[in-house]
Design a protein with these regions (language model features):
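Surface-exposed, low-hydrophobicity segments enriched in Gly/Pro/acidic/Ser residues
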Residues: 1-318, 437-441
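Exposed, low-structure sequence patches enriched in small/polar residues
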Residues: 136, 231-441
Length: 441
């Protein structure tokens, strides 16, 4: 019997009130869904409105490395797994260990992000609000499917042309910019002979803009033995941006399970100084050679706890000039008790190293070794009302100590309604910040 086709159309009207410009914005759009078979799905949106998506946490970041924000828009979340080319790109880790930022060629938060500033005359300035406000999308389309042992996905999105309020000191006027166009293509071939898993994939992305295009290509491979004890994941990629030399990078990760609940991981990566995937992906930095490892022990059905997970991990890295630019060791432990309350303890030690990023192109400088400590407690999150908090301390890069205090309360009267209240206090002493040129204080 042939499967029945499924399709849906959801038209909508969105009204946005802009209190700064004292304007009302009206958007009429529609979402489309079509599944001609169980192995193929097409979704599209025209003039989408993402006002219902959960807002991001407020993060004050004055460093040279970008903060990574999770995707929360449903259109981009659905079927996102096919574009996750390696475990390093998966942001859904539940390990107690400190995982760090992802390595991914596809970060859909770039789509509809901050606009590219328009060119203005010397002495004129664009209003800050227009430079940081998300750009509207004209539309997006996504196709995902599977044919035998081949899985594939294609995504395209188109931004509207942004408008900027410009001031030259005498009068204000409007200047129009140009939006970007985004494209993603993914192909994954899988095989499992004799119970072992083998796969090879290709992932390509493109960002097209009048100021210059950015194209990234990646090849990934995966292997797991039939017993599931040994797992290997690897990816190599290159970037080609207008006006920038072609860059290369890659990594390989090994994971070995000695027994259930006991694993050891080892990762090796290399990123040259020209690799740049951040027009549509995310890399915390380039110009790096890094080795990292992690050891995780998970125990269940203990006399005093339901589960206990202990994790110790660390990394060392240097840049292309041979400078030791980072190294640390992290010890974490999470105990989930029989009443589902939990306690999390983390201790991190960062080694003396050179910081070659936060001078913003003005050379490298030496920073001290540092210690971070934190202790957190949380009640049972499955109950309608839950709460928790944590306290922590950290050493600053050139001396001084900072302290953090966090608390939250959550009330979920039913599956469709939730109220969350969070408090974060950070008291910093000796915060090292770039001022201008070679001045850091």
């Amino acid at each position: 019997m042939a499967p029945k086709q499924q399709y849906s159309i959801f038209p909508f009207i969105a009204i946005t009130a802009d209190g700064i410009d004292d304007e009302m914005d009206y958007r009429f759009g529609s979402d489309f869904f079509w599944r001609p078979s169980t192995n193929l799905q097409l979704t599209a949106t025209i003039y989408p409105d993402f006002g219902a998506a959960e807002s991001d946490d407020v993060v004050i970041n004055l460093s040279a490395t970008e903060t990574f924000f999770l995707e929360k828009r449903l259109f981009f979340l659905e079927g996102q797994q096919i574009f996750t080319a390696s475990p390093r790109a998966d942001t859904r880790s539940h390990s107690v260990g400190t995982t760090g930022a992802p390595y991914t060629l596809v970060n859909t938060r770039r789509i509809g992000g901050k606009p590219v500033a328009a060119d203005v005359d010397l002495g004129s300035a664009i209003r800050t609000k227009d430079l940081i406000e998300p750009n509207d999308l004209l539309g997006a389309v996504k196709l995902t499917g599977q044919n035998g042992n081949i899985r594939y996905g294609v995504l395209a999105a188109f931004e509207d042309d942004p408008r900027f309020l410009v001031s030259d000191g005498v009068e204000d006027y409007i200047v129009s910019g140009t939006g970007s166009q985004y494209g993603i293509a993914r192909l994954l071939i899988e095989d499992d002979p004799g119970g072992a898993y083998k796969a090879v994939g290709i992932l390509s992305t493109a960002v097209l803009h009048d100021d210059g295009d950015a194209v990234v290509h990646g090849v990934d491979g995966h292997y797991m033995t039939g017993s599931g004890k040994l797992k290997v994941d690897a990816q190599v990629f290159s970037s080609d941006k207008d006006g920038v030399k072609r860059g290369y990078g890659g990594f390989i990760d090994f994971e070995y399970a000695f027994r259930q609940g006991l694993t050891q991981r080892l990762g090796i990566e290399y990123l040259d100084e020209y690799i740049d995937v951040n027009d549509l992906g995310y890399l915390e930095r380039n110009d790096s050679f890094r080795i990292r490892t992690a050891h995780t022990r998970t125990s269940s059905n203990l006399s005093w706890a339901r589960t206990n997970q202990f994790d110790v991990r660390g990394f060392v890295q240097k840049n292309g000039a041979g400078l030791f630019t980072g190294g640390s060791m992290h010890v974490s432990n999470r105990s989930v008790f029989h009443n589902l309350n939990q306690v999390v303890l983390r201790v991190s030690q960062f080694f003396k190293s050179f910081d070659d990023l936060n001078s913003f192109g003005n050379g490298a400088y030496r920073i001290k070794d540092r210690t971070h400590l934190s202790l957190g407690w949380a009640s049972d999150r499955s109950k309608p009302f839950s709460f928790g908090g944590s306290v922590g301390s950290m050493s600053e890069e050139l001396g001084g100590n900072s302290y953090s205090y966090n608390a939250y309360m959550s009330w979920r009267p039913d599956d469709r309604l939730a109220f969350d209240l969070m408090l974060h206090v950070l008291d910093r002493d000796g915060w090292l910040l770039h001022q201008d040129g070679k001045n850091i204080a």
